[in-house]
Amino acid sequence: MIETNHKDNFLIDGENKNLEINDIISISKGEKNIIFTNELLEFLQKGRDQLENKLKENVAIYGINTGFGGNGDLIIPFDKLDYHQSNLLDFLTCGTGDFFNDQYVRGIQFIIIIALSRGWSGVRPMVIQTLAKHLNKGIIPQVPMHGSVGASGDLVPLSYIANVLCGKGMVKYNEKLMNASDALKITSIEPLVLKSKEGLALVNGTRVMSSVSCISINKFETIFKAAIGSIALAVEGLLASKDHYDMRIHNLKNHPGQILIAQILNKYFNTSDNNTKSSNITFNQSENVQKLDKSVQEVYSLRCAPQILGIISENISNAKIVIKREILSVNDNPLIDPYYGDVLSGGNFMGNHIARIMDGIKLDISLVANHLHSLVALMMHSEFSKGLPNSLSPNPGIYQGYKGMQISQTSLVVWLRQEAAPACIHSLTTEQFNQDIVSLGLHSANGAASMLIKLCDIVSMTLIIAFQAISLRMKSIENFKLPNKVQKLYSSIIKIIPILENDRRTDIDVREITNAILQDKLDFINLNL
């Protein structure tokens, strides 16, 4: 076992069958320490012994006693095998762009440990023990965002984490940037001296794209929950019919996501009395065409919310399954059979599952944005809002209301539409034609992560505008009451931002509500995806 502090421990046994997405999120936030079973450490040593025995037989093993990539037909002298691994890290250290935030990097460190703990990578136990010390002590390598093509895994960004294990590169420790060697001295951690295969095992995997995807899908679930809450507020603000959420309708469509969204909306509206049921509208027979006071159906953004957004809840659930599988996988090459010593050359480092699932999530992000944009448009025009003032102005003509916010939201929605294009179809040949097909998994994951920042602001704006719509109803309709769950949501918003009484800057309101969404400070109904 490794030393621990006051934080809870997460025990790694190699199988890691109890690992859940929430565990990864918790560890990525620095909330738990990593410890290992003694049985796992013994198993890893047996796997390492298998590799050492194989090397003594002068068997050519890719990346261990051969060159890398397109140079895989070149044999490396035995006395250069350890240097060969450190040299690998040197030539891969060529990333660019901003650094990943601390949460992503802690997630990467943990996922490397998970992958190597399976015992098929041929590394010594001290490799994952040292990495766990870095994670537990709070040593955060500075890892550039750009450089991976997601084939042979995330080679370039992972080289920065591997270098830090050896005391090279830059890290953040106690919120200060410093040389890795200095951080290791402060924390009394010995630099790792790589042996054969270990450099390759550290960089050859899908760990970066998996961390970004895991944290992003968790964030998307939080934002999607807020989006459904904003729809509930909008329905009340627009005095819309709830007949369309009758569970008899949705149970007949069979899709679990649609049923879930309808159930959530019904939980919000279970005590609502702010509309006349459209099914109760009557008329007197006449020979002439008559016009009803209101339509018997709402527009699609209101009526069809479960049908439109249900697939997104299913996609989030499926993405979590795929990401968890990837995190628990052995995604290295070559693999060393810890039981028989066989060397298996394959391509588990390919990130196509992550690429495809996160490209799909990018589409889902855009679809949520489109939906909320339509609801905001309804609330902002008196012709479609059942009498609310244009732009939800508290005094039309004198004040312009949320006109600027609607324009700003439209700008964000257009950005998301632009960014929703899939990355995985843009494969390009690289590295001496060895990597002639690449997954671009990190491109997909980074793209989704970037889009979520904009989506959260779009949801925030929708909440603010629906909040204003309800506030105006309260002033204009005597005894206007909200259903209990919607009232709780409304009350949690008014604790953070004021009702718009006159024209003022509203960017601060957006920032406050966005932070409240991400920090789970608003009273939304959980989706439990």
Curated annotation (Swiss-Prot):
Record-linked PROSITE patterns: PAL_HISTIDASE
GO MF assignments: ammonia-lyase activity; histidine ammonia-lyase activity
GO cellular component: cytoplasm
EC number in record: 4.3.1.3
Compartments where located: Cytoplasm
Keyword match tRNA processing: no
InterPro entries referenced in this protein's UniProt entry, alphabetically: Aromatic_Lyase, Fumarase/histidase_N, L-Aspartase-like, Phe/His_NH3-lyase_AS
Keywords: Cytoplasm, Histidine metabolism, Lyase
Cross-link (5-imidazolinone (Ala-Gly)): 151-153
Post-translational modification: Contains an active site 4-methylidene-imidazol-5-one (MIO), which is formed autocatalytically by cyclization and dehydration of residues Ala-Ser-Gly.
Enzyme class per UniProt: lyase
Residues found modified as 2,3-didehydroalanine (Ser): 152
Pfam family, one: Lyase_aromatic
Gene3D superfamilies: Fumarase/aspartase (Central domain), Fumarase/aspartase (N-terminal domain)
Main location: cytoplasm
Pathway terms, separated by semicolons: Amino-acid degradation; L-histidine degradation into L-glutamate; N-formimidoyl-L-glutamate from L-histidine: step 1/3
Family membership: Belongs to the PAL/histidase family.
Protein name: hal-like protein DDB_G0273787/DDB_G0273081
Phylogenetic classification of the source organism: Eukaryota, Amoebozoa, Evosea, Eumycetozoa, Dictyostelia
